[in-house]
Amino acid sequence: MDIRVEGGRVFVGDRFEDTSVCANDGKIDAIGTEGSAALRIDARDLLVLPGVVDIHGDAFERQVMPRPGVHFAMDIALFDTDRQVLANGITTVFHGVTWSWEPGLRGADNARAILAAMEELQPRLGADTKFHLRHETFNLEAEPEIIDWIDRRRIGVLGFNNHLPAIKNDAPVRPAKIAEMAQRSGISHDAFQNLVSRIAKCADEVPGSIERLSAAARANGIALLSHDDISPEQRRWYRSMGCRLAEFPTTIETAQEAASAGDHVVLGAPNVVRGGSHIGWIDAKDMIARGMCSILASDYYYPAPLLAAFRLAADGVTTFETAWTLVSEIPAAAVGLPDRGIIAVGRRADLILVDVTGGRPRVVATIVAGRVVYLAEAARIHGGQ
């Protein structure tokens, strides 16, 4: 169906214009031209923006397991998550699925189940939903299966995570973290500690596994991310394997190393909205002001990317036009999706209509590949003329 979004203030390229956007067959085929369409959308008094491209978020886990030990069916969880992301302007979402050495929510069976459910439900989901495999690097037994997934292009992006340091013997938050992870895993405290001790003995095998997985991803054109880099040296090591996205570097020096080499630095949009990291790490607004953050992700809260872009502009950290690229154009390009993230002829018709009159931005409509998948004000829809 062809669609015409008319009367809005449209973010075209790098500036706003009072114009219309026409889409046909899932792509933008005209900007600013007059004409009819099977479906017209009245965007008066609204901003028309490229949809959010969210490359890192695990908030969907709350729909899978809203309380420890309380599980819901995967299709229920994914459909509910889909409604949430669309209502918050996210048109492309990478669900960050952790496959850890832990059992339970982040274990092998759950990772397989989520991937299978996503593949089965994809045609019925509104958002373009992709799989971000967050591989715990000490999960050595998973390597052959992950390489198979990579070779079959079942993975959208591959992230390298290592949360073992947070629960090693000298970690200051160890007792609380172990209690949290044991509860999530569904095993006793003592059993979890024994598991940690056994896994930690495999440290010498981890670098080789990361190198093999990186090579497989590069061969298949799959973007690589490293999570919680602790030092410039670690960032350089990951970069040497083609990993050019640094997620949540833990120090300013590490973020600076990444940015100075042209790597993307991914930080959490909730960090911007809340005014700082919830665990006391680097401040996202400060990093953006210093040119050391190029991508914002929802992390654990789907409303955050939309809110963060407006917050950055309101606080004078950067212009809104620049802020919006942090949640749309730049993340799309960084993970190999140059067909979206910007409103231009020939690009995917992934658009959101946003009302900014009430003090906070509110998504009125979400369009994915030229299809209206979320609408809060039905009176704005009209038949073709």
Residue ranges and their predicted role:
Residues 8, 28, 329, 333, ...:
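C-terminal cap of metal-dependent C-N hydrolases
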Residues 8, 21, 26, 45, ...:
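Divalent metal-coordination and catalytic microenvironments
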Residues 43-114:
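Metal-associated gating/positioning segment near the N- to mid-region
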Residues 51-55, 93-95, 129-133, 156-160, ...:
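Hydrophobic faces of well-ordered beta-strands that scaffold small-molecule active sites
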Residues 99-229, 299:
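Metal-coordinating catalytic core of metallo-dependent amide/deamination hydrolases
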Residues 152-156, 238-245, 260-266, 291-294:
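Glycine-enriched alpha-helix->loop->beta-strand junction motifs that scaffold or abut catalytic
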Residues 219, 263-271, 275-356:
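His/Asp/Glu-enriched, well-ordered alpha-helical/loop segment
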